Amino acid sequence: VQMEVPFGVIFAYFMLKEKPTIRALIGIAIAFVGVYILTGSPNLDGKFIGIGLTILGSAVWALGQVMVKPLSKEIDPLALVAWLALFSGPILVMLSAIIDGNTINYLTNAKFDHWIIAIYIGFIMQPITYGCFYYVLKNNPLYKVLPIVTMGIPPTGLLAAIFLLGEKPTPELFIGGAIIIVGVILI
């Protein structure tokens, strides 16, 4: 939903004392208006849990990036990615076992191409992208870095939903999405 950026700016202000510009604050307000439109305002019937979890996920990711920023100044970016993976991997496997159940069955029955994709994401894509992100993050305020890093997510997700899942976008999606992107650009 691109709400990682406004949440990141807000958290960085309180936790890192990074003062956003007036333009960034206006951008945050505009982005929240876009989310209101995108989510089907004023009718949230049957959507509240999904929307709430999506926004919560954005906030948690942004909080994580704010917490990582001070570490990125002290630890090499690739080492930081490795340490985060070392601790988050087992936690995610445990959560999968609790929520999905039968995680061992999924792992033992995974096909060869699934393992290739997992290895590519875990050992090539993730270290390179997050390593570069943490390198840039250590020397720049969050409000300058997050919009650039996350700008490709909404169009990619929308196109994937349309072409891979056959979803039909609504006018609210386009209007709200455009407003969110304008807000993020201002940030």
Please provide the spans of the model-predicted regions.
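Hydrophobic/small/kink-forming positions within alpha-helical transmembrane segments
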Residues: 5-10, 36, 59-63, 93, ...
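Hydrophobic transmembrane alpha-helices of multi-pass small-molecule transport proteins
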Residues: 11, 20-40, 58, 172-187
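Helix-helix packing/entry segments at the starts of transmembrane helices
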Residues: 1-3, 68-90, 126-162
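C-terminal-most transmembrane helix of multi-pass membrane proteins
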Residues: 114-116, 150-187
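Loop-to-transmembrane-helix transition segments
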Residues: 49-57, 106-128, 149-152
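Transmembrane alpha-helical segments that form core, pore/gating elements
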Residues: 8-9, 44-104
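Hydrophobic core positions of alpha-helical segments in small-molecule transporters
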Residues: 3, 23-26, 49, 56, ...
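Membrane-interface helix termini and inter-helical loops of multi-pass transporters
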Residues: 36-49, 97-118, 162-171
